[in-house]
């Protein structure tokens, strides 16, 4: 502005020194509208000076005052603040949108970290979670859904609380997403119970420290790799080995034997797999629709693979919050499935990168152990009930030393390994009895009888595995009598570990079997002692207890005799 005023004064002084007929001797507004044929344009020099003087004088004029920007309705900063600590009710404005990261400015009522914000005047319900305070009233948030259509200046409401989700036996609510919105198009969720997804783990004085077995009714699990009530179990299995069927049978058995409820959290699930699981649960009766929906045994919470990282990073907490309600409010033994726990870590790694944090080893977030610990420590047994978690685990490049699975292993109480080799033999569930482990397999917890039987079964199976190379090369005839007896018992045990499932009745036509733990111990101990050496190994295949083995052997004998 000062330079333009200087130019203006120089031009005026130049005009005073020029001849009286000079075009700039009488500068006035009319000059700007004079025609090109005017006498004042006889000299090109005079024309240029005229334009320069006109620009300088007009630019030097003070700009007219602009009206102040209109404030949002509802008072200073917009919105009526009802809580001074959380800023609940304050209205902010979107300042920047970069993918899943949204920056919001608040004149007052700054929301704390992890507070849920809701975008107003948007086509969908878009929830933002505060992740960082940037200063000067600016917060950086992570979106729980797509940010398409979001624009700068759009209003954002501070809800004053973390993300809350509906809990309880709402009707209908079986199938919903990270923020509690139903996605099965069966109507709105009707409930008055909501809980925040960010909660503290139960206090130590409220936890039940006594170690107890959660009986599943599945022989191979209860005998060789028992689940701890309130423990964490890692489920390893590739595609097509029966992982989904095992999950559904666990849900069914826990509901029938313990009256418990199950929650399935699909973290980074393929949409197709999630839909298949939903349909199969409806067909098997685990999920009931219509008038019988209150009798459903399972709730599904999905943050699918195509969702933004914020949704995938929080859907595990949503499922856990639903499970916590059934544990604490209804005193139930809840079964929580998380598929896949690696996707939870992966999503938090993406969020960390979006927030500009320096990555740790192998590109993971520096808060890897904290993020995973915050989830795992809430999965525990209290004096009211328990949450037993079965978590599918993906191991990147089969590297067990990768930070993500290595950190997860530290929290596990048991591992259930599904083997493709066993499934190829037609033995279901295809649980590997030698690779599956449990911290509960101790005589101090299980008792001497259970422990000795389990170790005896594993010893026979391991000896059989060691003899398989010799059998393949030389044949059974070259084995000693003791080895032949070991092989015969091992093959019977291997088939006796199979079991018909209730949820597979529609496929196999065989009724499902629930086997009590005591019966499993007695039956397998009898096989180890040689009480059933005279029975054919076919009679041990796909049955429940030992009584069914004897009945099946008699039936086979009668058919052979006839």
From Swiss-Prot:
Subunit structure: F-type ATPases have 2 components, CF(1) - the catalytic core - and CF(0) - the membrane proton channel. CF(1) has five subunits: alpha(3), beta(3), gamma(1), delta(1), epsilon(1). CF(0) has three main subunits: a, b and c.
Entry GO terms, CC: mitochondrial inner membrane; proton-transporting ATP synthase complex
Subcellular location: Mitochondrion; Mitochondrion inner membrane
Record field: catalytic activity: ATP + H2O + 4 H(+)(in) = ADP + phosphate + 5 H(+)(out)
Coiled-coil region(s): none
EC number: 7.1.2.2
GO molecular function: ATP binding; ATP hydrolysis activity; proton-transporting ATP synthase activity, rotational mechanism
Transit peptide: 1-55
Residues involved in ATP binding: 237-244
Name of the gene: ATPB
Family matches, as Pfam families: ATP-synt_ab, ATP-synt_ab_N, ATP-synt_VA_C, Synthase_beta
Its biological purpose: Mitochondrial membrane ATP synthase (F(1)F(0) ATP synthase or Complex V) produces ATP from ADP in the presence of a proton gradient across the membrane which is generated by electron transport complexes of the respiratory chain. F-type ATPases consist of two structural domains, F(1) - containing the extramembraneous catalytic core, and F(0) - containing the membrane proton channel, linked together by a central stalk and a peripheral stalk. During catalysis, ATP synthesis in the catalytic domain of F(1) is coupled via a rotary mechanism of the central stalk subunits to proton translocation.
UniProt-listed GO biological process terms: proton motive force-driven mitochondrial ATP synthesis
The name this protein goes by in its record: ATP synthase subunit beta, mitochondrial
SMART domains listed in its UniProt record: AAA
Top-level taxon of the source organism: Eukaryota
Transmembrane segments: none
InterPro entries, per database record: AAA+_ATPase, ATP-synt_VA_C, ATP_synt_F1_beta_sf, ATP_synth_F1_beta_su, ATP_synth_F1_bsu, ATPase_a/bsu_AS, ATPase_alpha/beta_chains, ATPase_F1/V1/A1_a/bsu_N
KW Translocase (keyword) present: yes
